[in-house]
Amino acid sequence: MPDDAALMKVEVAGVCGTDVSQYRLPLRGGPLVMGHENVGYLSRVGATFAAHKGVKEGDLVFLEHYLPCGHCEWDHMGEYRHCAATEWFYDPKAIRYGYTSTDIAPGLWGGFSHYLYLPLNAVLHRVPKGLTAEEAGVATPMSNGIQWALIDGGVGYASTVLIQGPGQQGLCCLMASKHAGADRVIVTGTSKDARRLEVAKAFGADVVIDVETEDALARIMESTDGRGVDVVLDCTVGAGTAPTLLGIEATKRRGGTMVVQGEGNQEFPSFPIGRLTRKGMTLKSARGHSYRAVELALHQLASHRFPLELMMTHTFGLAGVDYAIKSVGGQGAPGAIHLSVLPWK
C-alpha cells in the first residue's frame, strides 16, 4: 500500500434510493462494487496519509463518496459534489465510491465489501465519541437533509416548512428543520407511507398528511392560518409533477423557496413558471451535500435528540445486499426506511 493511502475496514454501508436506481440500470464502465454511504475503522494508514489527514490507525471515520481533484474552485469551497473529477453522472471514468469500476486499480471502491481503499484525496470525517458506527451510517441522508433544508432552503428559527415524502431523506430534512428551530413542519406522504408518517410525528412533525385520502392544500392552509409555508422541500423522486404543483400553491403569497431533490427524471413540459414568478419564489435543485453539511450532520446525530432507532429499521450482511436494495425500493422487507449493510455480520 502506498505511503499516501489508507485502508478502511467497513463497519456500515448505508443503502439509499440512489442504490435502487443504480441497481436497475445497465453497468457503466465495467463491473463495480456498490455502496457509497460508508463508515469504518482505519486499519492501515500510510505515514503521509496520516500526517496530511490528521488520523491514525483505529480511528472510526465517515467516508464521503466523492473523490475530488483537490485543486478546483469547488474543492476549495468544500463543495466536492461539483468537482468534475468525481462527477460519475457524466463521466464513467470519474472516481466515486460505490460507482467506480473494479477495473480501476486497486478496485476497492465500494462499501458493500469488507475493505475500502483510501487515496490521499479521500474525504473523511472523524465520528464523534458517543456515536456508534451504525448511527453514523445515517450521516449521508442527514447531511443531505441539512444541506437541502438549512443551507439551500434557508430553514431557520420560526420557519414554516412543507416536506413532501417521508422517506429517509424527508425524515432527515424534518430533523434538520426542527433542530434549526422551525416553528411548524408539515410532512406529506401516501397511504403506503402510514408508518413513516408515524415516525415523522415522533421526530416532531406538527402536521402529517396522507395526500391520497386528504385535501393536502386545504390541510396545509388550515394549519398555517391561510398563510402557506416559507419553504418547500420536495423529496418525492418518481412521484411525477403533482408535488411540485402542490409546493407552488402551498407557498406563501410572496417570497418563499422550493427545493426539489435533483435525482428525478420526470419531464415537466408545462411548468407553471408564471405562478412561480408572480409569487417571487426561488426554485432550487438539491443534489448531494457539502463538507460543512457532513460535519453538522455528525454533530446533530451525536446529540441523540431524535429517536433514530425508529428510522434505522433493518440491517443485512453481504449476502443480503440484493434483498436490502430491493427493500429500499419497496419490494422486500416491510416497513423499510433506512437500511444498513454490515459486511462482517
Language model segments and positions:
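Glycine- and charged-residue-rich phosphate/anionic-cofactor binding loop of Rossmann-like
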Residues: 284-287, 299-322
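C-terminal capping/lid region of NAD(P)-dependent oxidoreductase domains
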Residues: 210, 222, 226, 231, ...
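Residue-level marker of beta-strand positions
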Residues: 37, 59-60, 74, 115, ...
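Glycine-rich beta-strand-centered segment in the early N-terminal region that forms part
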Residues: 1-13, 25-76, 80-81, 128-130
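Mid-domain Rossmann-like dinucleotide-binding core that forms the NAD(H)/NADP(H) cofactor-binding site
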Residues: 114-115, 122-214, 218
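Cysteine-cluster motifs in flexible loop/terminal segments that predominantly coordinate metals
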Residues: 16, 64-124
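Glycine-rich phosphate-binding loop and adjacent beta-alpha segment
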Residues: 182, 195-201, 206, 237-303, ...
